[in-house]
Amino acid sequence: MLGENLKALRKQRGMSQEVMAQQLNIVRQTVSKWEQGLSVPDAQMLTRIAELFEVPVSSLLGEKIEEKADTDEIAAQLA
């Protein structure tokens, strides 16, 4: 669930893995591993990620965060 939430938050903000990694001073592959569930950030890094996305740490670890649908996608579905 953590990996899914990280990916959803990153995409909601239009952020690439590379940009997220740069802002956290880590390599892109680390972000990828977190999102795939192959590794997990330590407690200090979880705090930094929560600060980056302006969310509580509990929301990173809690319920699944849904990705917001693209407005173009919604318009296409309504047409």
Regions found by a protein language model. Give the residues of each.
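Charged, helix-prone or intrinsically disordered regulatory segments positioned adjacent to compact structured domains
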Residues: 57-79
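Recognition helix of helix-turn-helix/homeodomain-like DNA-binding domains
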Residues: 24-40, 63-65
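Alpha-helical residues within the helix-turn-helix
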Residues: 11, 22, 51
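DNA major-groove recognition helix of helix-turn-helix/homeodomain DNA-binding modules
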Residues: 44-59
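Alpha-helical transmission elements in cytosolic ATPase-linked domains
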Residues: 1, 33-36, 48
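Short basic helix-loop element that most often maps to the first helix and adjoining turn
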Residues: 4-19
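Short coil turns linking two alpha-helices in DNA-binding domains
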Residues: 16, 27-30, 42, 56
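Cytosolic nucleotide-binding catalytic cores of signal-transduction proteins
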Residues: 4, 22-25, 43, 47
